[in-house]
Amino acid sequence: MKKNFWEGYVAPGRVFGNLYFVGTRPASTHVLATEEGLIVIDPGYPEALDTVLENMRAVGLDPMQTRIILCSHGHYDHAGAVLPLKELTGAKTYVGKGDFDMVAKGIRTWAEELGTEYHEAFTPDVLLEDGDHVTLGGADILCLSTPGHTAGTLSFFFDVSDGEKTYRAGMHGGVGLNTLNKKYMKDNGIPEEMRERFLAGIERLKGERVEIFLGNHVPNNDTAGKLAKVAAGDKDAFIRPEEWIPFLESRASALRDLIAKEEREAETVRIIAEEKIVMIVRGVPAEQMIPLAEAMYRGGVRVMECTYDATGKTPDTEIAATIGRLAKHFEGRMLIGAGTVIRPDQVDLTASVGGRFIVSPDTSTAVIKRTKALGLASLPGALTPSEATTAHRAGADFVKLFPISNMGASYLKAIRAPLSHIKFLAVGGVRLENMADYLAVGAAGFGIGVTDADKKALAEGNYAAIEEKCRAYVSLAKGNA
């Protein structure tokens, strides 16, 4: 379990007029006060319900006057506290129709990703559909279906008043992209069209007049900062009609960026799989890297790994600068990545200069996860079935079986028997004489290092020798020998 994921205090307060914020930093909860009772929007985590109740009392609201509990969507951080709040107050519960299985059956609630379990399943009193209205004591909340984050995500629009002025408040019910990445969608059987529905919802909501933009999460609209301004005397701090459209556009752009990142990542994985050869360059002076890479390119190499210096003699920044120069020089012709990556910050550095993949000597899940988060291909090192499985589950695209020379082709055959779904690269001691043996037992590719002989040829300007070597390896790997 992620330690106390529900904690994070935000001083409660009045948003404007009859609308209040009583939630926490991880989970926003708003309350609309009416003549006939309270409407609680997204009660949050069950673990934080006591805090929400205390916050309600702190702003002068009686939790026992809650008549309606309204959920923007069915995830644990929004609907987890519905059941205990309903049991306490007897309020009616409202959820988008598309999220019925989430709240009633505990399916895909995001509780598992937080390391906990969803025990608070409930059957909603009302299942809302697009265009429905939730009314109580003069309040009228328009509910618009905006699927994407979940199938049943609802966005809310309603008037708030201080008795003198009335403003239109609006909230998108779920803009997180954690459920719209390709892996999550594939693992959970979510159709890719959900992304298009998300974007369509964004466009639709641009047509809604919103003067008070409410955050479905605190950072969306700087809830905490605005509450502090209200507390300091600026009662109109939340009245920002200029914020709504830019926020929506930023979320649409974020999804398009995610799609582009995933497409680039998929292209990297495809090229590595097709080319089969990753040339590993270590200890070559920076000024010789481009001439060396050009010779490799002429020899048919399309994937090149530049290693960081584990001894620390050459600073990471210098090696990253070389990777950046190579990436720029060979854009569209050759993939450039980093090797001997042992820390997440090295992943960040590589990504910042245009590197396309990360090779590690070990199975560091922190490195793998950071690699995937940045849209790079992951090639960690492993030797045992347990290590290989750990790497694969963390998101590795290939697993580098290293050093393969210690084990031989028979070991690759044995490890692939139960793990045929993992793409193994044979690295360490691979020669022209034994490549066919590894290919015969299912090697997905190879890592081939630059040898002392290659460095000597480079120093002598004998690029033809380097080309010839590369051509021989590439030809054999692709079955053209």
What residue ranges belong to the model's regions?
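C-terminal alpha-helical cap/extension of soluble enzyme domains
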Residues: V218-N221, E267, I290-P291, K413, ...
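Hydrophobic faces of well-ordered beta-strands that scaffold small-molecule active sites
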Residues: I277-V281, M304-C306, I336-G339, I358-V359, ...
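Active-site HxH/HxHxD metal-binding segment of metal-dependent hydrolases
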Residues: L19, E47-D50, M56-H133, G233, ...
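Metallo-beta-lactamase
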Residues: G8-Y9, R14-F16, L38, Y45-E47, Q65, K97-R251, ...
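Conserved beta-strand hairpin/beta-sheet module of binuclear metal-dependent hydrolase folds
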Residues: F5-V59, P63, S155-L177
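Conserved N-terminal beta1-alpha1 strand-loop-helix module at the mouth
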Residues: E265-I336, V341-V353, A373, E433, ...
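Active-site-adjacent beta->alpha loops and helix N-cap segments on the catalytic face
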Residues: A286-Q288, A310-K328, P344-D348, I358-T390, ...
